[in-house]
Amino acid sequence: MPTLHLISSTLNDELYQQLMTILLDDDVLLFTDQGVYNMQSRNALLNQYTCYALISDLQAYGLLEFVKKTSCKIIDYPEFVQLGIHYERSISWH
């Protein structure tokens, strides 16, 4: 069963390793709040997994233009809700 991983803070090395250990190929990442900073520092995630980021957080942290150049999908709050409905299982990383 695919999992939606909600990443809302900057992952330290230990949390990052835990995440990498449990991620499956069909899992999805959603970056929110300060978690959007991981998109720069942990950009290997962007190439290996389907990922999403909230546009309001990207704008707030000045990362919108950076993320537009990646394969990450930029979404709004209604789309965030739809992701939560679609994925029966979610894990929050913070």
Located regions from the model:
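N-terminal beta-loop-helix "entrance" segment that forms/cooperates
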Residues: V36-N47, L63
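A short, acidic, amphipathic alpha-helical segment used as a generic capping/interface helix at domain edges
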Residues: E14, Y37-Q40, D76-E79
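C-terminal structural segments of small proteins and small subunits
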Residues: E65-H94
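Short acidic/Ser/Thr-enriched loop-to-helix initiation segments
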Residues: Q18-L19
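Short internal beta-strands
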Residues: L29-Q34, T50-D57
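Short conserved AdoMet
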Residues: L24
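Short hydrophobic beta-strand segments
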Residues: P2-S8, E88-W93
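Short, glycine-rich nucleotide/cofactor-binding loops
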Residues: T3-L15, V28
